[in-house]
Amino acid sequence: MLDSTRLRNPQLFDKIVTPEEAAALITDGMNVGVSGFTPSGYPKKSTIALAKAIKEGKRCRINIWSGASVGPEIEEELAAVGAIKGRMPYYAASNKSMKKGINEGKIEYVDQHLSHFGQQVDYGFFGNVDVAIIEATAITAEGNIILGPGVGNAPIFVKHAKKIIIEVNTSIPLNLEG
């Protein structure tokens, strides 16, 4: 349950939406930056909701950007429904639908050195970050995001995103802050 220990700015309670409403903000052709670095600290709910909407007929293919590999709620769920147009800078080979899509040429993939990607996004080399989807532990009274354990390129994506979706994960201990 999201409460004032996790969302400390009362003005932001008006912005809470369901995963399905968050997924509706993501449209065809967008560049979507997600938090996370390996299967840690990455968003889960909105990407699963997006995959479900696509299964039900929504037309949407997006580019997924991250700090490293992320978990199956992004790579497997979205690749399995044909939602991923492009993927950078890395993916987990254990996500079979992603691997198959890349090998069949259905998903454009750049296997780029992880340490270079954030700076290149910052310089605008790959275009705009349309949406950043960030997993957080909490949001402070000032509106600052307390990230989860896998930061990755989240700060760069937030800096440049036109829209920001924050998934507050209440299972992450609050003492991660600091």
Kindly label every feature range from the protein language model:
Residues 1-178:
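Conserved alpha/beta enzyme-core scaffold
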